[in-house]
């Protein structure tokens, strides 16, 4: 009677009947051996791909993906340029660490959330209980300005004689 040889397990089965083969193939050791065989095969394929890519790169057939590309570079966003600017003093005078939005904006660093970018809280005295430059909030709560811009309060009066952030100070008349 012919015996059945299992390549994965490197063993001969006692009989060549379908029921013996089925029982063997459902066994834990056989399944582990099959899993190990294909893991080893995948590692060999990955190493072969790495070796082929390295050889092609050394031969000059593949361009360096980390080399700077010719052409214009995209400038960083406006809120990422330059040092932090001082914020004009409010009715109570300038407080400690009252600097305008710096490289991370007034609300801290940007993080990617499931629905797009979100801002994290910024540690330090700049974001106290009332936040920077915020007056009484009233019943409506704070309103957000443009992304990277300061928080606005609906009850705060507008000061027209103050220069806008980023503008030079006005000359006295």
From Swiss-Prot:
InterPro entries: Matrin/U1-C_Znf_C2H2, Matrin/U1-like-C_Znf_C2H2, U1-CZ_Znf_C2H2, U1_snRNP-C, Znf_C2H2_sf. It comes from the Eukaryota. GO terms for molecular function: mRNA binding; pre-mRNA 5'-splice site binding; U1 snRNA binding; zinc ion binding. It is found in: Nucleus. A zinc finger (Matrin-type) spans 4-36. SMART domains: ZnF_U1 (SM00451). GO terms for cellular component: commitment complex; U1 snRNP; U2-type prespliceosome. Residues 72-100 are annotated as: Disordered. Its main location: nucleus. Belongs to the U1 small nuclear ribonucleoprotein C family. This is U1 small nuclear ribonucleoprotein C. It comes from Pediculus humanus subsp. corporis.
């Amino acid at each position: 009677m012919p015996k059945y040889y299992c390549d994965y397990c490197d063993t001969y089965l006692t009989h060549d009947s379908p029921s013996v083969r089925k029982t063997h193939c459902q066994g834990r050791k056989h399944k582990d051996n099959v899993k190990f065989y294909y893991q080893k095969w995948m590692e060999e394929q990955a190493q072969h791909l790495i070796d082929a890519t390295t050889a092609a790169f050394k031969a000059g057939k593949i361009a360096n993906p980390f080399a700077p590309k010719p052409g214009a570079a995209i400038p960083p966003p406006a809120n990422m340029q330059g040092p932090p600017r001082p914020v004009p003093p409010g009715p109570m005078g300038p407080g400690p660490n009252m600097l305008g939005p710096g490289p991370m904006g007034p609300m801290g660093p940007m993080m990617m959330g499931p629905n797009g970018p979100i801002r994290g809280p910024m540690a330090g005295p700049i974001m106290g209980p009332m936040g920077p430059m915020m007056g009484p909030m009233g019943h409506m709560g704070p309103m957000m300005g443009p992304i990277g811009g300061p928080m606005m309060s609906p009850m705060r009066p507008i000061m027209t004689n103050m220069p806008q952030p980023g503008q030079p100070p006005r000359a006295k008349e």
